Amino acid sequence: MNGDSRAAVVTSPPPTTAPHKERYFDRVDENNPEYLRERNMAPDLRQDFNMMEQKKRVSMILQSPAFCEELESMIQEQFKKGKNPTGLLALQQIADFMTTNVPNVYPAAPQGGMAALNMSLGMVTPVNDLRGSDSIAYDKGEKLLRCKLAAFYRLADLFGWSQLIYNHITTRVNSEQEHFLIVPFGLLYSEVTASSLVKINLQGDIVDRGSTNLGVNQAGFTLHSAIYAARPDVKCVVHIHTPAGAAVSAMKCGLLPISPEALSLGEVAYHDYHGILVDEEEKVLIQKNLGPKSKVLILRNHGLVSVGESVEEAFYYIHNLVVACEIQARTLASAGGPDNLVLLNPEKYKAKSRSPGSPVGEGTGSPPKWQIGEQEFEALMRMLDNLGYRTGYPYRYPALREKSKKYSDVEVPASVTGYSFTSDGDSGTCSPLRHSFQKQQREKTRWLNSGRGDEASEEGQNGSSPKSKTKWTKEDGHRTSTSAVPNLFVPLNTNPKEVQEMRNKIREQNLQDIKTAGPQSQVLCGVVMDRSLVQGELVTASKAIIEKEYQPHVIVSTTGPNPFTTLTDRELEEYRREVERKQKGSEENLDEAREQKEKSPPDQPAVPYPPPSTPIKLEEDLVPEPTTGDDSDAATFKPTLPDLSPDEPSEALGFPMLEKEEEAHRPPSPTEAPTEASPEPAPDPAPVAEEAAPSAAEEGAAADPGSDGSPGKSPSKKKKKFRTPSFLKKSKKKSES
């Protein structure tokens, strides 16, 4: 090694910078007004502009002068050449192709066909091409049959059942005239439309050629005519040649019951087919082999035939027959022979199979009762319509449920009403009559604008009336002003099961009527409480307001309650003494009045006083019987007034009232004299004695108004007399009456 060698310094080239990658914002000027306008644009508006850019090419074609000139020339050519020029038909086809919406994904056909090629190109010929004057020549039933049969041909092409221009599917149009629809000979299944079908009779003669110039394969229709002649119930006949069907028709064992599709066909008929039918003996033999009930006929070494009472039923049987043949052909190829197969018992399957009139599947609501094959055929028609075929099929039951509005249209208030309340020229004041009229208008407008939570449904025709009637039914989701909060009064953090148990318990109590006042107090449960009222002392004006369980015997009285029932024995005794003391003073006044009356001259009339309106009870009815006992015995007293009568029965009580004393100073009015002279009705003896006492007392009070015998004293300085209780006072008006 070299001794003067030293550590070398390794120098690396400077790192190369990565090339600048152009970004989106490098190409955009943020200060550009166009960029700012597009950035601030709403997403929906930006999407609309993008759609307009995509449709710009179509708009350019429609707005081009060349297109307008060509269209005008074709219209002028139509006026010159007639109804259906070739250019107009071509333009109509172009319009059909452009307006048809073809999805990006198509269902894969089992065997393929010409329709698959057409769909891949994005061009589909519509099935229902009956437009304008073409549809006038056919009635509604024939139009529907033409659309169904043409759609059936399209399905056969999609499933791969077609064999170039051969094989036929026919349907009966009219049973009386024996007219049938068949495809023109030379037209592919993918080209068949409703207007291109040919109408023929039972002998094969053309009745209506349709929209084509092609004829009919009468030799091919011979098989169909033989079946139609033998089976009046048959409305549709299908004759196809499939590889699997031809393979099964060549087997000696025939169609084996190894699949549900094979068992769903029922009794299968066989016929040794020897080519095109040329003689009548062959027709009779076919009719004999088919029988009156068979729906499926296998032509030996030739093909398959299915019949049905409708187009849908014929499609159902031919579809199951083709599937059963494919299953059998593949099974025998893998099993090695019929002896290695497990056969099903047709008798057991027949008991479980659905009848022709039973509905297939039940959905929500009330779906129609499907016939055999109708539900499957309708589903395939929806598929064709989604692909853009425009089948014109009348759907019996829509697959998609229409979302019913939560609130009916009539619930939306009217934006404009035809009622005006005040005009511009009116003043603020109005008459009461006009105000009332405007109030009626406001009520009517409010009723018109207020929605109703009902839904209208049209009822069909019935036997009684041919008109349809509108029936209003209550809507389920009717709007309410306030929403009910569930479990509003349930405390938080509670067990839901306990709440439900308590709710059920309350409901049972309500049903069994065992409501109580609540839990019984544990403190007062042993205390025995005596009733303050005993039996027979409850006074009321009606027995209906008294519970019979507690008061079975009630005293009915129209007078008021006794005010002395609440007083004790001591208070009653004091009151009795006070009454006796006041009574002695009244007796002295009565004696003075008698003396004054004797001294008065005989020609001076006595001042008359009307008797009281109501009699006073006798002594024995007024004096309570004093009893000795505790305070509870006070409740046993009879509800009567205290004793206010003197000891002698001849002497009556009289209570001088202040009103009577003031009236005594007045001179007798002339109106009072006839009152005294008027005869009074003869009352009972007891009230007469009672009425004499107050009159005598009043006469004494009139003779000597002063209590101390001085007639010169003023009434204000009189000695204070005992005043009767308020319940015994009689008004001045009653006393004068």
UniProtKB/Swiss-Prot annotation:
Compositional bias annotation for Basic and acidic residues: 576-601
Membrane topology: Peripheral membrane protein
Principal location: cytoplasm
Keyword Transmembrane helix: no
Compositional bias (Pro residues): 602-614
Extent of Polar residues compositional bias: 419-430
One of the record's GO cellular component terms: cytoplasm
Biological processes, Gene Ontology terms: barbed-end actin filament capping; positive regulation of adherens junction organization; positive regulation of establishment of endothelial barrier
GO MF annotation terms: actin filament binding; calmodulin binding
Keyword Acetylation attributed: yes
Family: Belongs to the aldolase class II family. Adducin subfamily.
Entry-linked PANTHER family: ADDUCIN (PTHR10672), ALPHA-ADDUCIN (PTHR10672:SF4)
Protein name: Alpha-adducin
